[in-house]
Structures are given as structure tokens and as C-alpha cells.
Curated annotation (Swiss-Prot):
Record function comment: Pigment protein that is yellow in color.
Family: Belongs to the GFP family.
Protein name: GFP-like fluorescent chromoprotein FP538
Biotech applications: Fluorescent proteins have become a useful and ubiquitous tool for making chimeric proteins, where they function as a fluorescent protein tag. Typically they tolerate N- and C-terminal fusion to a broad variety of proteins. They have been expressed in most known cell types and are used as a noninvasive fluorescent marker in living cells and organisms. They enable a wide range of applications where they have functioned as a cell lineage tracer, reporter of gene expression, or as a measure of protein-protein interactions.
Post-translational modification: Contains a chromophore consisting of modified amino acid residues. The chromophore is formed by autocatalytic backbone condensation between Xaa-N and Gly-(N+2), and oxidation of Tyr-(N+1) to didehydrotyrosine. In addition, the residue N lysine undergoes cyclization. Maturation of the chromophore requires nothing other than molecular oxygen.
Tissue-specificity statement: Tentacle and oral disk.
2,3-didehydrotyrosine PTM sites in chain numbering: Y67
Length: 231
């Protein structure tokens, strides 16, 4: 793959902006980071600039910043990389989150690449509702998302990919909190070639970096695409 063809380099900077509302609480988050598209690794630092401190677990937002920024996925040569091929125009993705206790979130994201700035811009809108007051999200009992594997399915007639994965938030008491992710990825330009169905394995870690003035945290992710060993 000719990296310059898609406006991507081995190392890219990222800038993030999210506006959202969870259980009626509005907030704005910004962030910056560094990622390695061809190694599938990235690290970002986020800060709540409006609406902080958040009255709910920030882990539910992590999946709006990551688990969809698929440019940073290590793809083998035998699988078409839909996400890098969409650059520099980029792509959009929309995701529904259905939690086991009936809570629901919707996240819509727009991703573009600035070749001049060597930067990937990530803008998102996040809305969540119906989180129980005594549940793990509102009581901030989550610690991180468990490593997982998303099935990626092409829809050639529409030029989109659909993602399906059952996710689990790890809890402080050792339990798990289940959430179903359904995602639609759509390139802004017409794809010249679609991939076959495949999987993306990913691991996301959050570390608190808050100070006396602002709620902050760091996210690191590693993502690798692979075909079925049995297909």
C-alpha cells in the first residue's frame, strides 16, 4: 500500500471534539493524540471542558472515541482496508449501544484527514438515556471495556460496512455489564473495492489523568483485523 495515496503516514496526530448528553446532563469533551495507522495503535488524551465533572462513568464515552476509529487498525495484505482506502475524505460511523438494563446510547462520528496538517479530525455527538440511578454507569462502578472482537460485514450495494459485537464493561466488584454494539461505517467516497467479511480484535484501556481543575483521562487502543480461520 502506498501510504501517500491515502494521505496517511506511519505516525499521525489526532484531534477530537465530542458534544453529548447522558440522562439529561450535557457536556463537551476535547482531546488530542498520536496514532500509528499501519500498526493499529493509538493513544489520546481527553478533557471535559463543559459539564464536568461527569456524573456518570466516562467508560461509556470511550467507545465513541475508539472502537470505530478504524483507520488505526492493523490490516493484513489479504483483506481490503476499507477505512484507509476512504482517506483522505474519510468516513462516518453511527453506533447504537443497548445495555443489559435497558439503557440506550447513540453515537454519530465524522472522521476526516488533513494531509497538510498530518492530522485526523474526529467529531462526534453522543446521546445516552435510561441509565438507572443505582446502576453501574451512574454509580461509576466500571473500570474498563473488556477486550473484544467485532464482526465486520460488507453491504456492497450500499458501499457500507456493518459491525456487530457484544461488549462487556468490567466492574469494580469483579462483575461484567453487557452491551450490544451495532455499527454502520460509511466511506464519504464510493469504495473502489469492498472487503470480505472479517473480524477486528481490539483492546482499549483507560487511565485517569484528572487534576484539581479538570476531569481528564487517557485512552490507548490496539486493533488487529483478521479473516476467519475456518472460512
Amino acid at each position: 500500500m502506498a501510504h501517500s495515496k491515502h494521505g496517511l503516514k506511519e505516525e499521525m496526530t489526532m484531534k477530537y471534539h465530542m458534544e453529548g448528553c447522558v440522562n439529561g446532563h450535557k457536556f463537551v469533551i476535547t482531546g488530542e493524540g498520536i496514532g500509528y495507522p499501519f500498526k493499529g495503535k493509538q493513544t489520546i488524551n481527553l478533557c471535559v471542558i463543559e459539564g464536568g465533572p461527569l456524573p456518570f462513568s466516562e467508560d461509556i464515552l470511550s467507545a465513541g472515541f475508539k472502537y470505530g476509529d478504524r483507520i488505526f487498525t492493523e490490516y493484513p495484505q489479504d483483506i481490503v482496508d476499507y477505512f484507509k482506502n476512504s482517506c483522505p475524505a474519510g468516513y462516518t460511523w453511527g453506533r447504537s449501544f443497548l445495555f443489559e438494563d435497558g439503557a440506550v446510547c447513540i453515537c454519530n462520528v465524522d472522521i476526516t484527514v488533513s494531509v497538510k496538517e498530518n492530522c485526523i479530525y474526529h467529531k462526534s455527538i453522543f446521546n445516552g438515556m435510561n441509565f438507572p440511578a443505582d446502576g453501574p454507569v451512574m454509580k461509576k462502578m466500571t473500570t474498563n471495556w473488556e477486550a473484544s472482537c467485532e464482526k465486520i460485514m460488507p453491504v456492497p450495494k450500499q458501499g457500507i460496512l456493518k459491525g456487530d459485537v457484544s461488549m462487556y464493561l468490567l466492574l469494580k466488584d469483579g462483575g461484567r455489564y453487557r452491551c450490544q454494539f451495532d455499527t454502520v461505517y460509511k466511506a464519504k467516497s464510493v469504495p473502489s473495492k469492498m472487503p470480505e467479511w472479517h473480524f477486528i480484535q481490539h483492546k482499549l484501556l483507560r487511565e485517569d489523568r484528572s487534576d484539581a481543575k479538570n476531569q481528564k483521562w487517557q485512552l490507548t487502543e490496539h486493533a488487529i483485523a483478521f479473516p476467519s480461520a475456518l472460512a
